[in-house]
């Protein structure tokens, strides 16, 4: 009976691996566990178009979603007339510095493919808006205007997103201060 007890978990593990093995081997750090619902929705929408063109589907990755959530940085812009603007944003430097915290390799590469924004005042509001976004080709262009997820950047395999409050604020030279909440969703690809 002891032997059967020891062998049973091994057989289950082997069977489970056989049933879930992807067409190509995944890196050891890859896991769908922890991927957020919105990343899954985006990947489903985008993959319909990618697969229709014969391109490999994007995958969701819990580690990427966790990394994006950890990588907010407060940005500051000082205007020539002395006005100081601040806001939150996900930055490439923060992504790179947090890689080991989520178990991703140090040579991971990233590209931001879109912001989803619509003057949303809460997490739920931007979540519902983002779920309904029409993913036209125009939405997914990088800083140089190149199409990314549909016809280029095909070496990027993973998609992730994060929703956060930009926490915009402005301090004028006369001391007047204003702040506002605007929730946005950033969509990134990783390879």
Question: Would you name each region that the model predicts?
Answer:
Residues 8, 12, 20, 41-46, ...:
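Generic ordered-secondary-structure signal
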Residues 91-191:
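A well-ordered secondary-structure block
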Residues 1-25:
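Ser/Thr/Gly/Pro-rich low-complexity, disordered linker/stalk segments of secreted
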């Amino acid at each position: 009976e002891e032997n059967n007890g020891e062998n049973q978990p091994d057989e289950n593990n082997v069977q489970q691996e056989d049933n879930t093995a992807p067409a190509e081997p995944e890196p050891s750090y890859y896991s769908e566990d922890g991927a957020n619902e919105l990343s899954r929705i985006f990947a489903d929408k985008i993959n319909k178009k990618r697969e229709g063109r014969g391109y490999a589907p994007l995958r969701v990755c819990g580690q990427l979603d966790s990394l994006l959530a950890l990588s907010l940085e407060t940005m500051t812009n000082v205007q020539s007339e002395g006005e100081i603007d601040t806001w939150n944003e996900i930055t490439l430097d923060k992504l790179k510095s947090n890689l080991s915290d989520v178990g991703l390799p140090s040579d991971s590469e990233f590209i931001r493919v879109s912001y989803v924004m619509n003057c949303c005042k809460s997490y739920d509001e931007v979540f519902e808006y983002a779920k309904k976004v029409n993913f036209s080709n125009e939405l997914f262009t990088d800083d140089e205007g190149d199409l990314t997820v549909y016809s280029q950047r095909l070496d990027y395999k993973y998609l992730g997103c994060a929703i956060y409050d930009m926490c915009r604020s402005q301090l004028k030279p006369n001391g007047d201060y204003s702040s506002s909440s605007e929730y946005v969703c950033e969509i990134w690809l990783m390879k």
